[in-house]
A protein has these predicted regions:
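Conserved adenylation A10 loop of the ANL superfamily
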Residues: 1-9, 136
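AMP-binding/adenylate-forming
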Residues: 11-19, 35-90
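Short helix-loop-beta connector
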Residues: 30-34
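Short, well-ordered beta-strand segments
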Residues: 37, 172-173
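Gly/Ser/Thr-rich phosphate-binding loop
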Residues: 93-150
Length: 183
């Protein structure tokens, strides 16, 4: 992915991308006609998967140039958005952008860790916010953690078809047969 080194090419099957999109859309209850914000670069799996989710679920994709302030010119309510922590942090610094963020029903945050200060601010938001766990090789995320509201949790919940275990040297083994060929 490039987050820990030089990015390299990977090959995935379309079916795996469709499966990943369905897992997310089903888990979050996304339906045809819901407005979803694409505000991440298409050269990364996160941006690509937003497009695939919109195609699979029939979402109305609202496309914005990737920036540190994705809510700066949004003038409509959105059902779903995916952002990186820096985008969320920047958005919360500007009152008008924060107000627009609060009009999103569901926000997923991935691509980096969420520090304690940001997580505390997220807990005050009146929308559903999730942190994602995954990587390029799992076609974005395979687990979600609710960050706010009555269902907030300190733990990630893997999608139903995903099995997690530890190897003999205590490294994580991810068995996600719908989205990857390897564990």
């Amino acid at each position: 992915s490039g987050s820990t080194g030089t990015p390299k090419r990977i090959m995935v099957r379309k079916e795996q991308m469709v499966n990943s999109a369905r897992l997310t859309c089903d888990y979050l209850g996304l339906r045809q006609g819901d407005k979803a914000l694409l505000c991440m670069p298409l050269r990364y799996i996160a941006g690509k998967m937003m497009v695939v989710r919109s195609l699979v679920a029939g979402l109305d994709l609202v496309i914005r140039e990737p920036s540190g302030h994705p809510m700066a010119d949004i003038d409509m309510p959105l059902r779903f958005a995916a952002m990186i922590p820096l985008q969320v942090y920047n958005t919360l610094q500007v009152p008008e952008e924060r107000e627009r963020l609060c009009q999103i029903d569901i926000l997923i945050i991935g691509g980096g860790s969420i520090d304690h200060e940001l997580e505390t601010r997220i807990q005050e938001l009146p929308i559903c916010v999730y942190s994602t766990y995954g990587m390029t090789e799992t076609l974005s995320h395979i687990a979600l953690r609710r960050l706010n509201g009555p269902d907030a949790s300190p733990y990630y919940t893997p999608f139903p078809s995903v099995k997690l275990s530890l190897s003999t040297d205590d490294t994580l083994i991810i068995d996600a047969p719908l989205v990857t060929d390897e564990t």
